[in-house]
């Protein structure tokens, strides 16, 4: 079984649809407009709300604050960095070893030509900085 964390959004909804041949659960602070029957409400800022059921083999971590108008800006770090730490702790508690983590091209800065993992980090906003810090946590 896979647990998609943050699967109620745009990317998560399409991912869950593609995983229709697998047993999947969704954990999100928002309800899912398409997969309400497999969605549990939870906020990764609170370790106690990260419910990983027995039989879960992999976590797909999509949850993030990403909009440009997030206020206060500390939410980027509370969700993207501390939330990642909380997910890793919940995984450790449940004995889950596999994580698929989605980062962002925003960690490489503006006007980069096809950056990959070998490019130097040069985040230009709080979202990029927080995703870079989350990568460092993992």
Language-model features: locations:
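Rossmann-fold cofactor-recognition segment
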Residues: 33-46
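SDR active-site strand-loop-helix element
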Residues: 5, 27, 59-63, 99-105
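Short alpha-helix in the Rossmann-fold core of NAD(P)-dependent oxidoreductases
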Residues: 77-84, 100, 130-131
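Conserved glycine-rich Rossmann-like NAD(P)H-binding loop of the short-chain dehydrogenase/reductase
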Residues: 22-33
């Amino acid at each position: 079984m896979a647990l998609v964390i943050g699967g109620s959004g745009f990317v998560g909804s399409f991912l869950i649809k593609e995983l229709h041949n697998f047993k999947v659960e969704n954990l999100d602070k928002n309800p899912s407009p398409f997969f309400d029957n497999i969605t549990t409400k939870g906020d990764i800022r609170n370790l106690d709300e990260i419910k990983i059921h027995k039989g879960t083999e992999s976590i797909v971590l999509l949850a993030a604050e990403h909009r440009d108008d997030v206020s206060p800006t500390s939410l980027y770090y509370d969700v993207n960095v501390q939330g990642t730490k909380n997910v890793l702790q919940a995984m450790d508690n449940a004995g889950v070893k596999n994580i698929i983590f989605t980062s962002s091209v925003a960690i490489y800065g503006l006007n980069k030509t096809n950056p990959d993992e070998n490019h130097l980090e040069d985040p230009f906003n709080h979202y990029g900085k927080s995703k870079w810090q989350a990568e460092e946590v993992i």
